[in-house]
Design a protein with these regions (language model features):
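Short beta-strand to alpha-helix junction loop
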Residues: 62-63, 90-99, 137-157, 299-304, ...
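Glycine-rich FAD pyrophosphate-binding loop
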Residues: 25-44
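N-terminal Rossmann-fold NAD(P) dinucleotide-binding loop
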Residues: 16-17
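Helical element adjacent to the flavin cofactor pocket in flavoenzyme catalytic cores
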Residues: 137-178, 188-192
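Beta1/beta-strand and adjacent pyrophosphate-binding region of the FAD-binding site
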Residues: 2-13, 31
């Protein structure tokens, strides 16, 4: 007997889970196909930051804020650990402080709850901050912290208990209009098919990626043992200002980039910007570097890890910590400046990928858009 669904989702990372979630919320019969026993890619290898502060004001900021709402709903419904810990951007140079002042004073901060703190006020808000050399801090209360190593499993379990058909340890080897073929030869039939295959650009619709400027990105990360302090808030420094689109229109950003290129070129050569997230158990997730291209080495470089730890150690007290884990993640990213790759290679099949390292922040809202639009299209077709 044919297996018939309203929606078939390929890939159980955060993008795939979000499509299944949106389909379920719309009353659809959903099947979710995942080739691994559980999510093992970028969804579990990241900071766990829900990061509206880094998204450009406008469409992406609104998406991030909607995703934030969805994560809080998942915290209530699925038991996902999502904490409203906020973020702190640390300025240790006058040009970095100028960027933060420009950001708060302009429309670039629209939709956020931001404030500027003196070194004294910042040290009271974050007991681990190093005050020596600190110029000022921008604090935002908008960002969430989730536990990436458990979030996907909890969402998947809740989806399954709510009626979504979970097909684990089986891969989709072919997708056509209305049908997905699995490795065991089974055929699933569905009105809408969403392909969210993460870093796998070769199996399903490789032409869709070849037509776009898509690259894989390898990033090195670590976790540190819990320090003596507990702050919760995500920490970012001056390097991060040049990484996220939210700060692009701040006039002083050029000075920040030029100074790092001149004085510390190693960071730019390896795409390093440094952030830290504190887990519920107090341990720190830190990173990261960015190496683009198909030939990224499978071996991690300790000089990159050392540079990340040393830079973070200038912002917060790491004297009582040590490295407990090292890993690298890989994600797909569009290199033409666009936020997401979305296309329909054949009628009824949507490929969604390349959210550029912001899958946790943008994925839930983008998936909601995709599902809503596909349902609207189907309704229009019925009335044509």
């Amino acid at each position: 007997m044919a297996e018939q669904y309203d929606r078939i989702v390929v890939g159980a990372g955060i993008l795939g889970l979000s499509h299944a979630l949106a389909g379920l919320a719309a009353g659809e019969r959903v099947a979710l196909v995942e080739r691994e026993p559980r999510a093992a890619g970028a969804t579990v290898r990241n900071f766990g930051m829900i990061w509206p502060v880094g998204m450009r004001a406008g469409e992406d900021r609104q998406r991030a804020l909607r995703s934030r709402e969805i994560w809080l709903e998942l915290s209530r419904d699925a038991g996902v650990d999502a904490r409203s810990d906020g973020s702190m951007h640390i300025a240790r140079h006058e040009d970095e402080w100028a960027v933060l002042q420009e950001f708060v004073a302009s429309d670039a901060s629209a939709g956020l709850e931001c404030e500027l703190l003196s070194p004294e006020d910042a040290s009271r808000a974050h007991p681990g901050l190093r005050v020596e050399g600190l110029v000022g801090v921008m604090r935002s209360t908008t960002e969430l912290a989730v536990e990436p190593r458990t979030a996907a499993d909890r969402i998947a379990a809740w989806l399954e208990s709510s009626g979504v058909t979970m097909l684990r340890s089986t891969a989709a080897v072919r997708c056509e209009t209305g049908v997905v073929v699995l490795t065991d030869g089974r055929e699933l039939y569905g009105h809408a098919i969403n392909v969210c295959s993460g870093a796998d650009l070769r199996v399903l619709f490789p032409d869709a990626y070849e037509r776009q400027q898509v690259s894989l990105c390898k990033l090195q990360m670590m976790s540190l043992s819990a320090p003596s302090w507990r702050a919760g808030a995500h920490v970012a420094g001056g390097l991060t200002l040049g990484h996220y689109a939210a700060f692009e229109d701040c006039p002083s950003l050029t000075s920040v980039r030029e100074r790092y290129a001149r004085e510390q070129p190693f960071f730019g050569e390896h795409g390093i910007h440094v952030m830290s997230a504190q887990r519920a158990d107090g341990t720190l997730v830190i990173g990261d570097s960015h190496e683009y291209g198909p030939g990224a080495s499978p071996f991690d470089r300790e000089d990159i890890n050392d540079a990340i730890v040393n830079y973070l150690g200038e912002m917060v007290d790491l004297r009582e910590t040590h490295v407990i884990d090292r890993w690298h993640g890989v994600y797909a990213k569009r290199m033409d400046g666009q936020t997401v790759l979305r296309c329909e290679p054949v009628p009824g099949v949507t490929v969604l990928n390349c959210v550029g390292g912001a899958g946790m922040t943008l994925g839930p809202a983008i998936a909601e858009e995709v599902v809503r639009q596909s349902r609207n299209f189907a309704t229009e077709g019925q009335h044509a």
